[in-house]
Amino acid sequence: INASSSPLIVIDGIPGGDLRSISQEDIQSIDVLKDASAGAIYGTRAAGGVILVTTKKAKEGPITLSYTGELSTEQVSRRPQVLDRDAFVRFGVGTDLGASTDWYGELLNEGALSQRHVVNLSGGGHTAKIYATIMAQDQKGIAIGDNRKDYSGRINANFNLLDDLLEIGLHTEYREAHRDQRSSSSYFDMALKMNPTEHVYDSTSETGYNVLVGGSEYYNPLAEVMLKQADNVDKWLKADATVKLNLPAGFSAQATLGWEDRQYQQTHYTSALHRTSLNGSYKGRGFHAYSKTVNVSFEPTINFMRVFADDHTVSAVAG
């Protein structure tokens, strides 16, 4: 019997988290436990170590609103060297089909603009503080058919009550990620093998692309991308509440209740006019998958910490 070698992810005290569910702007700190302390707290789940992620909390002070925006683009710094049309014809490598095609360049999405927008709200007094953030991101990959869109929102609220005897922390977060995964490295491999005099487009074709069918080992890599759909959607909805009671003599009792709903959906479709459909006499092919996971956790602990002679600290935790 083997335990997982992957580290246990603990987000704001809730074990079993997923780093993909957190926006980078919301992370305050990341700590790694890899010694006996990991096993002492989390047991056999921590056999591969523990990654502790703490999200940002509000700071005391006036309510502040901030905005961060990013714009970016990508370029290929160095491309593979292949024969262009003139060299291909001059050396008599193959049949001259009349076109002049940069197959590698046809698959690139150079110059496309990616953007990211984040709005933060933070502030409050000693008794009640709030931190909230909203993020939207549209990332254009350098390859056609390799794009991603992300949306997320988070609210962290903290309360100190009864002269700091009682501390309450509330967290809720929603994140959604859409991924276009039509691209593949195999298409770039094919682009390096293609005849540079072959046509990319065909005005007589219903698709508009020169779809190469038959027994040839070569195919139009751009048509391969454009005549199919490969969408993946991830959704996370999380909420947790922590109640901490500060007791005399260095003792404290804490309980954390967490809830997480994760949904994952795949939608893949290949057109009836795609090369693989025509070669296989298919009228198109589709695939849809959906999964949903709900996790509920409860973590009660009792803590002890005392400082002796200003230099010596003794701490213990049980839970």
What are these regions (language model features)?
Residues I1-I155, N160-L161, L166-G169, R175, ...:
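Short, small/polar-rich motifs associated with maturation and membrane association
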Residues K59-S100, I142-D146, S152-K238, T256, ...:
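Surface-exposed loop/interface segments of Gram-negative outer-membrane beta-barrel transport/assembly proteins
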Residues Y104-G105, D189, A249:
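Intrinsically disordered, low-complexity regions
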Residues N120-G123, K244-A249:
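Long hydrophobic segments that form regular secondary structure
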